[in-house]
Design a protein with these regions (language model features):
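Contiguous beta-strand segments within globular domains
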Residues: 28-64, 90-94
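Extracellular Ig-like/FN3 beta-sandwich strand-entry sites
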Residues: 59, 104-110
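Solvent-exposed serine/threonine-rich low-complexity stretches and specific carbohydrate-binding patches
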Residues: 73-88, 132
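N-terminal signal-anchor transmembrane alpha helix of single-pass membrane proteins
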Residues: 1-31
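Short, hydrophobic beta-strand segments
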Residues: 90-104, 116
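Short beta-strand elements
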Residues: 117-139
Length: 139
């Protein structure tokens, strides 16, 4: 085998391994996402985010936003953060929204968890996504 053929075979094997990792193993996938209200505390509305991590979600990020249903251009976005510290299996996290930003009426809370990977470019091209939206009535 000459050098060019060896390079092409190695590159094809690495690409195939990356594709199989993304399509079959789905490392860091987060599923079973649910969101529930948990009351108010210290000027914040609390919501509990439940999810299941199939493996270490080192490159997963959670984002959440609150949208006013009466005025859809009014959106309150929470801070994007990593799920790097969570355990394999079922996990819970609190999402906090400042109450003084909310007006009475119907609101929509949307939570998105996106998993990418810096080692495998197929996760960047086709990230794993999970989301949940709930309707909330603010008094």
């Amino acid at each position: 085998m000459d050098g060019n053929t060896l390079f092409l075979v190695t590159a094809a094997a690495a690409g195939l391994a990356g594709l199989l990792d993304r399509l079959i193993l789905r490392r860091g996938q987060v599923s079973d996402v649910t969101v529930e209200p948990a009351g108010s505390e210290g000027g914040y509305r609390c919501y509990v985010l439940h999810y299941h991590a199939s493996s270490d979600p080192d490159w997963s990020e959670v984002t959440y936003s609150f949208r006013d249903r009466k005025r859809p251009t009014t959106v309150i976005t929470g801070r994007t953060r990593s799920l790097a510290g969570c355990a394999i299996g079922s996990n819970d996290e609190y999402l906090l929204i400042r109450e003084n930003l909310l007006t009475p009426g119907p609101w929509e809370l949307t939570v998105r968890i996106t998993t990418t990977c810096r080692r495998n470019p197929f996760y960047s091209l086709f990230p794993l996504k999970a989301s949940k939206t709930i309707q909330v009535q603010i008094q």
